[in-house]
Amino acid sequence: RAYMKIVIKAKIPVVLATSPTMSCNYDCVGCYSRDRVSENELSTDELDKLYKEAENLGISTIVVTGGEPFLRDDSVKLAEKHKRLLFVIISNGSFISKELAERISRSGNVITLVSIEGFTADTDLRRKKGAYEVVLSAFDSLKKSDAFSVLLLRIQQ
């Protein structure tokens, strides 16, 4: 409650949501990025300036979504550069290798939300065959590297 009082009194938002890319390696039915073309994406330098300005304004959290944020090679690099910001990166998990998970863990300011549709059949149906195992592997890599991560369950009827 104390935190919410501060947030409500704040003159600026505490969270900035960004979609550095709308590109994705999946073609999920019902996904808002499915039919979008990734044009006019901000460059790494432009994102760097945006995040610096966010810091200067007192914003504390950057939510990074997409598309698939890890299609870009600057997602963690920018978090490493802006240590005073907390980055919440929402991913489908398909690019999270052991090495990337370790880098995320070392950064100390990244929370990775890995989305999943449910069990094997649901996830594979919406994404593609084998996607469920990819998500579990990504989450396992994050867990083993001691990276702060959340499994984000997508519920739909």
Predicted regions and their residues:
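Conserved radical SAM core fold
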Residues: 69-71, 93-98, 114-129
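Internal, well-ordered alpha-helical segments in soluble enzyme and binding-protein domains
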Residues: 100, 131, 135-138, 151
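Alpha-helix N-cap and loop-to-helix initiation/capping positions
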Residues: 42, 46, 126-134
